[in-house]
Amino acid sequence: MVRPTRVRYTVLALTVAAYMITYMDRVMIAAAVPVIQKEFGFSLVTMGWILSAFRWGYALFQIPGGWLGDRIGPRRALSLIVTWWSLFTSATALAWSAVSMMVFRFLFGVGEAGAFPIATRSLSRWMLPAERGFAQGITHAGSRLGAALTPALVVFLMARWGWRAPFFVFGALGLLWVAVWYGYYRDTPEEHRSVNRAERELIHSAMGGPRPRVSAAVPWREIFSSANLWTLCLMYFCYAYCISVYLDWFPKYLHDHRGFDLTRMGLYAGLPLLAGTAGDLLGGWFSDLWLKRSGNLRRARRGVAIGGFLLAAGGILPATFTADPLACVLYTCLAVFGLELTVGVSWAVPLDIASDYAGSVSSVMNMCGNIGGAISPALLAYLVRSYNWEVPFVLSSMLCLVAAALFTRIDAARRISSPGVTA
């Protein structure tokens, strides 16, 4: 008996690498904020708007990005958008004012907008349904691992060549990934020469037959009329707001409020995201294990996500009010671990409810979520200026409780019905 090849796992590994690069490019500016502020004389609020500019571009172009992946296929779509955002990653180093930096960050966000929806679409043709939670967990773990390593790497590069150097280095890394992706990936297993018959049959039997390379038409009416999807979107709004606090401002918080010097900031700022990496891996894996043992998709997705949000809410408050800076970092690790337990599950739900249109459905979710992510950096700056650093974190804890409540209403077993999607 011929054993199936394992090409789908190489596809998954390339997708993990893409997720790592998205977050490395995204969070590198956070580690450079103290140096950029000093050079340009930007206020905290101005820096907040610069950080928000990326997320507005990212949020507003989610749906076009997901649509692009569904229409032309992930191979070409990801190659195009990663090239785009890598160029604007490097362009950030050429900014000469607050406005120019906002424009470059906005255009960078436009490119990154399609990354996760298109990558989700790329996995929908390759990963077995019982592997989806793990696949989403490990890809997002890759993104958080990239983010965790970035502060120390950025500080290292800045110490030798200035704050602009990391933007050029990371931009080049993205272009290298494009060359590998376009050369190896194919939109369906049937198109890949290295996939043997046994692996094709394994994938087809799990999915009920071969799937088309691209979707003929996206059923937008059915998508936008799904109450299940809108609940998912509201939940992800809360999540994205909370995680943005840590992605965009945690290094600055440690430097200004907790008294860490630049070197210690670089070392400690990545620890919560390292804990988040473990959360991503465990959340998706445990949800899939729960599904295999119980056969109950609804409970397998809900249980993990609700537990994660409650853990996050419980970790944020002691991190905020402890007087010990190291205890603050440790409690923050617990909070981000809880937040990231929810991510693989959240991104598995679009695959569960609309696999043929996973790119479009996940883009709607990610757009709504990242409106929260776009509001977060600027609002935090205003809250800190008007009150103190504690208020934004208390707000994040409250939003975690709201997200947990919303997930009690999300049903991963309720598929979006349309002429092209079987209910």
Which residues are covered by each model-predicted region?
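Conserved MFS/SLC helix-loop-helix module at the cytosolic interface between two early adjacent transmembrane helices
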Residues: 60-99
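A membrane-interface helix-boundary motif in multi-pass transporters
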Residues: 159-172, 261, 300-303, 382-398
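Helix-loop-helix hairpin linking two adjacent transmembrane segments in secondary transporters
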Residues: 143-192
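Cytoplasmic helix-loop-helix junction between adjacent transmembrane helices
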Residues: 104-144
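Helix-breaking motifs and short loop linkers at transmembrane-helix boundaries and internal kinks
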Residues: 41, 73, 88, 94-100, ...
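Structural signature of the two symmetry-related core transmembrane helices
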Residues: 76-90, 298-316
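Residue-level signature of mid-helix packing/kink "hotspots" within the transmembrane helices
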Residues: 27, 55-63, 113, 147-148, ...
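Extracytoplasmic gate region of multi-pass secondary transporters
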Residues: 29-30, 224-281, 342-343, 347, ...
